[in-house]
């Protein structure tokens, strides 16, 4: 590698990669994703991985005799459910991903949004219970970890100044992290991107188009939250955000090489 290559490598922005959905229940999917991440990191592209774990949370709540309720695509989080949700996300989900990363040869660090003062967190809406919203605060810990060549794996659990453990939507957590490190944002889901009313992939969307598709019910529930998070970053940072599928992990490498994958949310 030439000095020019090294300089180009050093200038690569951090890729904030949000994963979730059924990925955590698919060993092959996790393996392929982490192998792709290993190649990307080896090329000099730093990655922060952010995750939810809704499927596991649903399972754990059901096992504990608790009901899952959602409002506009966001999980309602009563105080009684917090121990289960925190355990599923910051515990089992985080360590499951960390194990897959280590198996793929990725040096990684499991953490949450509450670590090292990286985020300010508060309750989003009393109607949602202990659901949090976060704002970027201090990137120094993440910068230290990334400078070591390690991959942070961040669960979407935050803690408020009042000491409340809060469940943050993982797409919104990824948005805040992308802003914190001025990075590019890729939101991976169970589907290949945003689909139209006929189930066909939409290659590119702007706010006006999103508003229209939301109005007619094509974009709804969890995808609505995801697209709104993507628009937030696209507009505030002036760069496109990708929504793609974890099922096609090789596309991440293509994305790093400048190719478009999934749906691009335009500023």
Curated annotation (Swiss-Prot):
The record marks 18, 226 as: Transition state stabilizer. It is found in: Cytoplasm. Pathway: Amino-acid biosynthesis; L-arginine biosynthesis; N(2)-acetyl-L-ornithine from L-glutamate: step 2/4. One of its GO terms (molecular function) is ATP binding. It catalyses: N-acetyl-L-glutamate + ATP = N-acetyl-L-glutamyl 5-phosphate + ADP. Gene3D superfamilies: Acetylglutamate kinase-like (3.40.1160.10). Signal peptide: none annotated. Belongs to the acetylglutamate kinase family. ArgB subfamily. This is Acetylglutamate kinase. Catalyzes the ATP-dependent phosphorylation of N-acetyl-L-glutamate. It is an enzyme of class 2 (transferase). Its EC number is 2.7.2.8. Substrate binds at residues 53-54, 75, 167. GO terms for biological process: arginine biosynthetic process via ornithine; L-arginine biosynthetic process. Pfam families: AA_kinase. Keywords: Amino-acid biosynthesis, Arginine biosynthesis, ATP-binding, Cytoplasm, Kinase, Nucleotide-binding, Transferase. InterPro entries: AceGlu_kinase-like_sf, AcgluKinase_fam, ArgB, Asp/Glu/Uridylate_kinase. GO terms for cellular component: cytoplasm. It comes from Shewanella pealeana (strain ATCC 700345 / ANG-SQ1). Coiled coil: none annotated.
